[in-house]
Every structure is written in C-alpha cells, then in structure tokens.
C-alpha cells in the first residue's frame, strides 16, 4: 500500500491578506478548516509554517506542524523541507493550499488515483470550465490559469492566457465549442521527484508566466492530470473571506 502525506504550507506574511491562515471562520482558524477537510483521506497531515503564531494555533487544535525557513520561494520548497524534517517513509507528498478551506476530500482521492500508474511523477487537478461560465471573469481571467492536456491526461502546457486559441469563432462562442480546463492548485509528487524538482533553477517560461509548474515541464517532468467537477474557493483577500463566510453560513 502506498503511503500519502498531505503537507499544508502556511505563511503569515501574505501581501494581500496578512495573517490569512489564522483568519477566523465561524470559530475556527482557516488553517484548521483546511486540515479537517483532508485528514481522513490521507495517512498523515502536517502544516509547514515559518511563523510561531501559526505553529501555536495548529498545536491548539491538535494538528501536526513543522517549522520551516522563511526564505522559501514557493510552497513546493517549503513542502520538501517539511518532508525532510518529518522523516521519510511516505511514497507521495500532497501539497495542499492553505487558503482553500472548502477543498473536497474527493479531490484528494482523485489526485491519489493518479499514482495507480507507476509512471506518474507529479499529479495535479483541473476543472472543466462550464459552457455557461462568464467569459470575462473565467476564461479571460489571468489569475485562473488554463491547461491543455494530451491523450494520456498529462499536462502539455499551463498558461494565464487562453489556451487553445479558437480560430474563426467569436470569443463568446469559445466556451460552448471547446472544453477548456482551469487549473486547481493542488499538487502531489513522488518523494524522489519532489527532491529533484526543488533543486532545479527557475526557468524562462516559469518566470514569464509566474507559474512554477512550467519549470518542471521545461525540465522534462510529466504532470498527470486528474479531472474534478468540484469547485474550490481560494481566499486571497479579506473580500474573498467575506464571500467564504457567507458560503459557510448557507451550507
């Protein structure tokens, strides 16, 4: 049986929303809600942070937490340091966004299934855009990266631009005429692959698009893609939190 550990990178010093992991959501800090959403579908879960306030909050609700450097450029780097400190013994590390308190356990199961294929090195998730999605706020939104897949459900490219370009049709006809995929920022890596990719220098495409997964593709790694119909709600700003609290109240 393969063993899966979920690591939740959590920084206090967010530019747009300082202290975000500790933001109160109906009596629980957001980081606790993320932790509780995923803990039953993984062999182990751990928060990786660089801030003692987050460490204390996780310990207070009985979660596992590891202190990491404040110099990491990405959540992937923080995951690898945490994995080294926890001690090895897991086959796959799942990198879980600390600002998605409604992440669905089914999404974790979908990404785990990708590793039934012994050749899977890295896996991530996508969600198809709906044909009735608002074009401007969905497909045109650079904060919602798009993905194109090959016949083996591997990522060929990720972009903040719209890919593919539909020639000969008006923009308004694009969504009904083609299945576009939105990237969901959940990753999983085999342990050895995680070690390798954290040692790669930043790549030209990564710097151009500001998408770290392009570094892996540029260096020849394959990214298996699981398809989910579950929507995720990422919280980047205090305004996003207001919407999330309204969603929580209506559940």
Swiss-Prot record:
Pathway: Nucleotide-sugar biosynthesis; CMP-3-deoxy-D-manno-octulosonate biosynthesis; CMP-3-deoxy-D-manno-octulosonate from 3-deoxy-D-manno-octulosonate and CTP: step 1/1; Bacterial outer membrane biogenesis; lipopolysaccharide biosynthesis. GO terms for molecular function: 3-deoxy-manno-octulosonate cytidylyltransferase activity. One of its GO terms (biological process) is lipopolysaccharide biosynthetic process. It is found in: Cytoplasm. InterPro entries: Cytidylyl_trans, KdsB, Nucleotide-diphossugar_trans. HAMAP family: KdsB (MF_00057). This is 3-deoxy-manno-octulosonate cytidylyltransferase.
């Amino acid at each position: 049986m393969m063993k899966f550990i979920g690591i939740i990178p959590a920084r206090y010093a967010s530019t747009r929303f300082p202290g975000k992991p500790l933001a109160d959501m109906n009596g629980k800090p957001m980081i606790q809600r993320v932790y509780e959403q995923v803990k039953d579908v993984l062999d182990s879960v751990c928060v990786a942070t660089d801030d003692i306030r987050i460490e204390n909050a996780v310990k207070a609700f009985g979660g596992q937490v590891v202190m990491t450097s404040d110099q990491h450029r990405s959540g992937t780097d923080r995951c690898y340091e945490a994995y080294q400190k926890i001690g090895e013994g897991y086959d796959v590390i799942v990198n879980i966004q600390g600002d998605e308190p409604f992440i669905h356990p089914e999404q974790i199961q979908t990404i785990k299934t990708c590793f039934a294929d012994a050749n899977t090195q890295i896996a991530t998730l996508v969600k198809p855009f709906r044909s009735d999605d608002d074009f401007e706020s969905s497909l045109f939104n650079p904060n919602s990266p798009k993905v194109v897949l090959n016949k083996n459900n591997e990522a060929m490219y990720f972009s903040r631009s719209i890919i593919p370009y539909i020639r000969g049709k008006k923009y308004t006809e694009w969504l009904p005429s083609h299945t576009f995929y939105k990237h969901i920022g959940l990753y999983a890596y085999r342990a050895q692959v995680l070690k390798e990719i954290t040692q790669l220098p930043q790549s030209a495409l990564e710097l151009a698009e500001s998408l770290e997964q392009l570094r892996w593709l540029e260096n020849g790694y394959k990214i298996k893609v699981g398809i989910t119909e579950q929507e995720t709600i990422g919280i980047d700003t205090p305004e996003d939190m207001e919407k999330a609290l309204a969603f929580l109240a209506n559940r």
